[in-house]
């Protein structure tokens, strides 16, 4: 092959020039093999990229976002467990003439389950920060948790707004569960408001991590090592001819 063979650089690759005539070439060292007329250097694409050629990601903001996401995820797990626990207690006060739309819809249980799952993924994302699927799943579930908490806020406000004719157990002893039920709904309302803020903050940090990871493209500056440099020979003066020497002697 007499013509120069070129390879288009792709991601995770290094360009190295190798001689056509088979002389060994050490990367980074200039070869002193002379260039022959019919032997031109070839460009080969060698897989792999040196560590010094990869652009590093700003690790400090990423680690900060991961730690904050882990803390918020732990709080989400606690809120989810509180929803399930208080929902179980609410089941005991329904016999006391307390009407709870949120309980009949099952929100304290499936809402708390969503909060626990999203919080668990936020904690797991801190342990595996380079897992794109885990970060994306955590982001999606945090968005779902934010929507669920907004629905919970509406349901618990509705529970507290429903007029209960038997709100005075002194006059209606069989309506003892109204006041405890309203207290539980009020506590769950506060937890839903807290969960909404945490889920929105976790979604914000998750968007930052996903965007940072998707934009983390390795920038490679290919180095071309000259295998057979072209050396221009210095002009050499030709020796005097025999006839010129005879004339000089005369």
Swiss-Prot record:
Topology, Cytoplasmic side: 1-74, 120-136, 202-250
High-level lineage: Eukaryota, Metazoa, Chordata, Craniata, Vertebrata
Domain of life of the native organism: Eukaryota
Tissue distribution of the protein: Expressed by hematopoietic tissues and cells lines.
Record-level GO BP terms: cell surface receptor signaling pathway
A cellular component term, taken from the record's GO annotations: plasma membrane
Family membership noted in the UniProt record: Belongs to the MS4A family.
Name of one Pfam family that matches: CD20
Subcellular location, principal: membrane
Stated name of the protein: Membrane-spanning 4-domains subfamily A member 8
Annotated compartments: Membrane
Membrane spanning residue stretches: 75-95, 99-119, 137-157, 181-201
Extracellular side: 96-98, 158-180
Function (record text): May be involved in signal transduction as a component of a multimeric receptor complex.
Membrane topology (UniProt): Multi-pass membrane protein
UniProt keywords, alphabetically: Membrane, Receptor, Transmembrane, Transmembrane helix
